Amino acid sequence: MRGLTQRLEAARSYRGAWLRPSNFESFWETSVTFAQNAHVESAVELPSATQAATFKRITFTSTDQTQLRARVILPAGVSVAEPLAPAELPASAKLPAVVLFSDLGRGVRSWLHLLRFSALGLPVVALEARPCEAQLKDAWRGALTAEELARALVNPDDAASSTLKQLIDDALVTAAVASRFLGRTTVTWGEGLGGSQALFAAALLPKEVSVTMALNPLFADNATTLRAHVGCGDTPQSDAAIDAVGLLDSACAAELVRVPALIGTALLDQSAPTEGTFALYNRLPGQKEMRVYPKFGHERINQFENEQINYLCEVISGLCHN
């Protein structure tokens, strides 16, 4: 435990090897524009025995023209957006919707789990993520190291063609579509890959996202993770590779997050090392809180999920009184 304590103390002040590339915002501009113009193409109400909520499944198209699906729960009394002027929005529209992203290889959370948010009066949208490659299907269990994940999803020679780029695009489209469909801002939340998606959405969609939460977010401090491949910035080629992986770095995205953020890290996590998570956390410029779990690895942490509820109640109360 002494070793973990020393590692934690060293990590607390770490900010990562490299800051955000100068072309970060311009790189994502096309994706953001697409997301802000995307819309729900179909919405199907699902049968339910409860009157406490309405269950739907919506479809919409991502940047590569793949049709995505998401689960939607509307608490009783909440409906989809109406063409009202801002001053005419009902009081319930002040409450944001929770947009949930799953970890790599893990399916969408159950309808029952999603009800924990709708019980607070918050609509919920949960992306049904596209299938991943077979060798990545156990990533959510912590079966791959940070370097293995980065090598699989990040192309240092061409960030735009990286698998991770498309997965972040999916998150941007989901958050923007959810905000427009429900007529309110969103809380983006995810674990692992989903945590990175949540943070990128908060960074790049400031009008659509009002709070973000991430547990063990992947792909933070990519230049350190991939140092053997991208080098140390001592040649033009190395500089270019470092910038490329920085475009897909959740710690770089964190520099643009202005909304309240709750971040969690597990000290035994080899997929999302604590050092990278602190690099991300220390670069968040706005209101932020960190939770550290010494005895956990890359896994679901019930204590964090319980603390989420208290955090949401506090933050949303502040949002509604502003």
Task: Locate predicted features.
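C-terminal catalytic histidine-bearing segment of alpha/beta-hydrolase fold enzymes
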Residues: F278-N322
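Hydrolase active-site cap/lid region
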Residues: G195-D243, V292, R300-Q303
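The feature captures the conserved acid-bearing segment of alpha/beta-hydrolase catalytic domains
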Residues: A223-R283
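Cap/lid segment of the alpha/beta-hydrolase catalytic domain
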Residues: L114-R116, P123-I168, T224
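Alpha/beta-hydrolase fold nucleophile elbow
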Residues: F181-G192
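Short beta-strand element of the alpha/beta-hydrolase
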Residues: S92-L104
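The serine-hydrolase catalytic nucleophile loop
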Residues: L104-F117
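N-terminal targeting or regulatory segments adjacent to alpha/beta-hydrolase or S9 domains
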Residues: M1-A53, S79, L84-A91, L120, ...
